[in-house]
Swiss-Prot record:
Gene: pitA
Residues at which acetyl-CoA binds: 88-90, 96-101, 127
Protein species of origin: Pseudomonas aeruginosa (strain ATCC 15692 / DSM 22644 / CIP 104116 / JCM 14847 / LMG 12228 / 1C / PRS 101 / PAO1)
GO terms, molecular function: acyltransferase activity, transferring groups other than amino-acyl groups
Protein name according to UniProt: L-methionine sulfoximine/L-methionine sulfone acetyltransferase
Keyword Transferase tagged: yes
Lineage, top ranks: Bacteria, Pseudomonadati, Pseudomonadota, Gammaproteobacteria, Pseudomonadales
Positions with a binding annotation for substrate: 75-77, 85-87
Subunit text: Homodimer.
Length: 172
């Protein structure tokens, strides 16, 4: 699949919204049960921009959004600066074509360029494809939490994975 990875713009928000709401309604990748509107995604976009965090999109030659990825603060406390939690979502009809790998690789490069130290992934434990993608790019499982969420009438387990972006870096 030939896709371009680039910074998202406001014009990409309808495509991002469609992918997000599909994940809400049909997967356990997002633990929300209520779809959001464009104003919600605009507020999210504005917050990421204000914080200096990227939103990347994979797009086809026509500019159509095929997937997106982003990261933000892991926790809102000063001691966690340098650690971010990320998300990668690919449109349903584009999964399995390597877009997740492209997006996550680009996100890792961006995090390293920003001087970040650790990227964290919080993945529903039954999502073997996402766990495999993260393992492929060097993430390791750092914890598991059984039955901490619920969706579609069942309990969800959470797997945490992390990637140390610069293992040789000294503590500040």
């Amino acid at each position: 699949m030939s896709a371009s990875i680039r910074d998202a713009g406001v014009a990409d928000l309808p495509g991002i919204l469609a992918i997000y709401n599909d994940a809400v309604g049909n997967t356990t990748a997002i633990w929300n049960e209520t779809p959001v509107d464009l104003a919600n995604r605009q507020a999210w976009f504005d917050t990421r921009a204000r914080q200096g965090y990227p939103i990347l999109v994979a797009s086809d030659a026509a500019g159509e959004v095929l997937g997106y990825a982003s990261y933000g603060d892991w926790r809102p406390f000063e001691g966690f600066r340098g650690t971010v939690e990320h998300s990668v979502y690919v449109r349903d009809d584009q999964r399995g074509k390597g877009l997740g790998v492209q997006l996550l690789q680009a996100l890792i490069e961006r995090a390293r360029a920003q001087g970040l130290h650790v990227m964290v992934a919080a993945i529903e434990s039954g999502n073997a494809a996402s766990i495999g993608l993260h393992r492929r790019l060097g993430f390791e499982i750092s914890g598991q939490m059984p039955q901490v969420g619920q969706k579609f009438g069942r309990w969800l387990d959470l797997t945490f994975m992390q990637l140390n972006l610069d293992p040789t870096r000294s503590a500040p």
